[in-house]
């Protein structure tokens, strides 16, 4: 048993230049762990609370000194003395100390920083990689990456309503090969955008945010980029996209207002919008759609899942917010067939693991994800392997805070050697073989 002796938090910066919480944790044996907390731009309204100072004279109100103080003055007093390897007890103690359902008192950013630092210190204490500590000897599945290469919606200033357009190297044989395929496609995409006179400046997650004309043009350009890189769309590299539909849902009319449809924009009922998505699925090698409808319209999600869920992966992000209560509701209602996992949506590693396990037991896939405001912390790369989750969403082929996760995955694959497994399209166990074959044959 190794006792936690010291916990210290400080304010550092994320990839957008905004403050975030960094926590360092030490044990009596000298083991050490550090955790840095990410932050989202497009956030679900039911996420755990990210505590910000609100002082407009400092970082435009985005400072996190309150969260830092909560670690140094409150959480440290509670957690010092705990066995560093008892992750569940540490996380539950912080949840109890907070005492709110959404971690509003201490802040999920304070709690998560300690949770990650404790896990890393425990791995250091036991002299094992983090993925082994979290997942045990059976941690061996390397994830298929979702690489966000074109941005729209809240992540860009253009006429594209959907927030993210991603490539997934489903035909690769290893994560190293998948990353190479993604990199080659990314650079060919850049060349195509240059040829068409579009900007190749990159956004928060490393993807391009060109001023595209409508919602279909990104799919056309991605297919061209995949082919120019020497790969077959669908068979080698499939396409995924995140609608982030809550961002363009009109609560007053109950319709989805899309500026990228028609000459002057167009509004759709839920049924009409799902029909539009269905037509995209039929036309392009789509393997996954995230947040196709507003996060509060569960009955519409049922309808969408019934129509699209046998064809493609339907991912709940804002819908589930990595929360087992919402996920259990979705499973019971037959809503979605996949969950996006973001550690800061729920606030502890213990609760994150519980959400992944619940999803897998129900036949849902679990996609471990970054946030738009990231850091050099690579915990999610270890977590996705630890849980054999099989899919990771961690940005494009640019920006060091994104590449750091890919580099860590390649290190892990090297460490696992012949015991590692990359499943590609076969990791979509939420789709039957016929659906997978349809996607890879387009």
Curated annotation (Swiss-Prot):
<dbReference type="GO" id="GO:0009986">
    <property type="term" value="C:cell surface"/>
</dbReference>
<keyword id="KW-0479">Metal-binding</keyword>
<keyword id="KW-0324">Glycolysis</keyword>
<dbReference type="GO" id="GO:0005576">
    <property type="term" value="C:extracellular region"/>
</dbReference>
<feature type="binding site">
    <location>
        <position position="371"/>
    </location>
    <ligand>
        <name>(2R)-2-phosphoglycerate</name>
    </ligand>
</feature>
<feature type="binding site">
    <location>
        <position position="242"/>
    </location>
    <ligand>
        <name>Mg(2+)</name>
    </ligand>
</feature>
<feature type="active site" description="Proton acceptor">
    <location>
        <position position="342"/>
    </location>
</feature>
<dbReference type="Pfam" id="PF03952">
    <property type="entry name" value="Enolase_N"/>
</dbReference>
<comment type="function">
    <text>Catalyzes the reversible conversion of 2-phosphoglycerate (2-PG) into phosphoenolpyruvate (PEP). It is essential for the degradation of carbohydrates via glycolysis.</text>
</comment>
<dbReference type="GO" id="GO:0000015">
    <property type="term" value="C:phosphopyruvate hydratase complex"/>
</dbReference>
<feature type="binding site">
    <location>
        <position position="290"/>
    </location>
    <ligand>
        <name>Mg(2+)</name>
    </ligand>
</feature>
<comment type="pathway">
    <text>Carbohydrate degradation; glycolysis; pyruvate from D-glyceraldehyde 3-phosphate: step 4/5.</text>
</comment>
<feature type="region of interest" description="Binds human collagen">
    <location>
        <begin position="73"/>
        <end position="140"/>
    </location>
</feature>
<feature type="binding site">
    <location>
        <position position="342"/>
    </location>
    <ligand>
        <name>(2R)-2-phosphoglycerate</name>
    </ligand>
</feature>
<dbReference type="Pfam" id="PF00113">
    <property type="entry name" value="Enolase_C"/>
</dbReference>
<keyword id="KW-0456">Lyase</keyword>
<dbReference type="InterPro" id="IPR029017">
    <property type="entry name" value="Enolase-like_N"/>
</dbReference>
<dbReference type="GO" id="GO:0001968">
    <property type="term" value="F:fibronectin binding"/>
</dbReference>
<feature type="binding site">
    <location>
        <position position="163"/>
    </location>
    <ligand>
        <name>(2R)-2-phosphoglycerate</name>
    </ligand>
</feature>
<comment type="similarity">
    <text>Belongs to the enolase family.</text>
</comment>
<dbReference type="GO" id="GO:0004634">
    <property type="term" value="F:phosphopyruvate hydratase activity"/>
</dbReference>
<feature type="binding site">
    <location>
        <position position="372"/>
    </location>
    <ligand>
        <name>(2R)-2-phosphoglycerate</name>
    </ligand>
</feature>
<keyword id="KW-0460">Magnesium</keyword>
<keyword id="KW-0963">Cytoplasm</keyword>
<dbReference type="GO" id="GO:0006096">
    <property type="term" value="P:glycolytic process"/>
</dbReference>
<comment type="function">
    <text>'Moonlights' as a collagen receptor. Binds host (human) collagen, which may contribute to pathogenicity.</text>
</comment>
<dbReference type="InterPro" id="IPR020811">
    <property type="entry name" value="Enolase_N"/>
</dbReference>
<feature type="binding site">
    <location>
        <position position="393"/>
    </location>
    <ligand>
        <name>(2R)-2-phosphoglycerate</name>
    </ligand>
</feature>
<keyword id="KW-0964">Secreted</keyword>
<feature type="active site" description="Proton donor">
    <location>
        <position position="205"/>
    </location>
</feature>
<dbReference type="InterPro" id="IPR036849">
    <property type="entry name" value="Enolase-like_C_sf"/>
</dbReference>
<dbReference type="GO" id="GO:0000287">
    <property type="term" value="F:magnesium ion binding"/>
</dbReference>
<dbReference type="InterPro" id="IPR020809">
    <property type="entry name" value="Enolase_CS"/>
</dbReference>
<protein>
    <recommendedName>
        <fullName>Enolase 1</fullName>
        <ecNumber>4.2.1.11</ecNumber>
    </recommendedName>
</protein>
<dbReference type="InterPro" id="IPR000941">
    <property type="entry name" value="Enolase"/>
</dbReference>
<feature type="binding site">
    <location>
        <position position="317"/>
    </location>
    <ligand>
        <name>Mg(2+)</name>
    </ligand>
</feature>
<dbReference type="InterPro" id="IPR020810">
    <property type="entry name" value="Enolase_C"/>
</dbReference>
């Amino acid at each position: 048993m190794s006792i936690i002796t010291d916990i210290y938090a400080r304010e550092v910066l994320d990839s957008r230049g905004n403050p975030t919480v960094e926590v360092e944790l030490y044990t009596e044996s000298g083991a050490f762990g550090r955790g840095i907390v990410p932050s989202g731009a497009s956030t679900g309204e039911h996420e755990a609370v990210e505590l910000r100072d609100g002082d407009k004279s400092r970082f435009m109100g985005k400072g996190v000194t309150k969260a830092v103080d909560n670690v140094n003055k409150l959480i440290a007093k509670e957690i010092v003395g705990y066995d560093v390897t008892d992750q569940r007890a540490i996380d539950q103690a912080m949840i109890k100390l907070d005492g709110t359902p959404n971690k509003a008192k201490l802040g999920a950013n304070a709690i998560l920083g300690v949770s990650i630092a404790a896990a890393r210190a425990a791995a250091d204490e036991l002299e094992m990689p983090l993925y082994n500590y979290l997942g045990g000897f059976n941690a061996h599945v390397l994830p298929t990456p979702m690489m966000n290469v074109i941005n729209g919606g809240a992540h860009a200033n253009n006429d594209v309503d959907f927030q993210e357009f991603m490539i997934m190297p489903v035909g690769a044989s290893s994560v190293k090969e998948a990353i190479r395929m993604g990199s080659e496609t990314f650079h060919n995409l850049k060349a195509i955008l240059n040829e068409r006179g579009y900007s190749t400046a990159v956004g928060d997650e490393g993807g391009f945010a060109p001023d595209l004309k409508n919602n279909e043009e990104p799919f056309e350009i991605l297919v061209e980029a995949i082919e120019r890189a020497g790969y077959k769309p669908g068979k080698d590299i499939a396409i995924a996209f995140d609608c982030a539909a809550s961002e363009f849902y009109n609560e007053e009319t109950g319709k989805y207002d899309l500026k990228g449809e028609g000459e002057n924009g167009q509004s759709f009922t839920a049924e009409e919008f799902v029909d539009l998505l269905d037509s995209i699925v039929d036309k392009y090698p789509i393997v996954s759609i995230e947040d196709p409808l507003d996060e509060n319209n569960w009955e519409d999600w049922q309808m969408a899942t019934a129509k699209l869920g046998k064809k493609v992966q339907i991912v709940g992000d804002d819908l589930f917010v990595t929360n087992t209560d919402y996920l259990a509701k979705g499973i019971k209602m037959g809503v979605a067939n996949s969950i996006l996992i973001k550690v800061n949506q729920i606030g502890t590693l213990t609760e994150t693991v519980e959400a992944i396990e619940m999803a897998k037991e129900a036949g849902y896939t679990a996609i471990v994800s970054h946030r738009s405001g990231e850091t050099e912390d690579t915990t999610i790369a270890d977590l996705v392997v630890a849980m054999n989750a099989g899919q990771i969403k961690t940005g494009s082929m640019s920006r060091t805070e994104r590449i750091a996760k890919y580099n860590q995955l390649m290190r892990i694959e090297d460490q696992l050697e012949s015991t590692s497994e990359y499943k590609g399209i076969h990791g979509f166990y939420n789709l039957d073989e016929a659906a997978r074959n349809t996607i890879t044959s387009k």
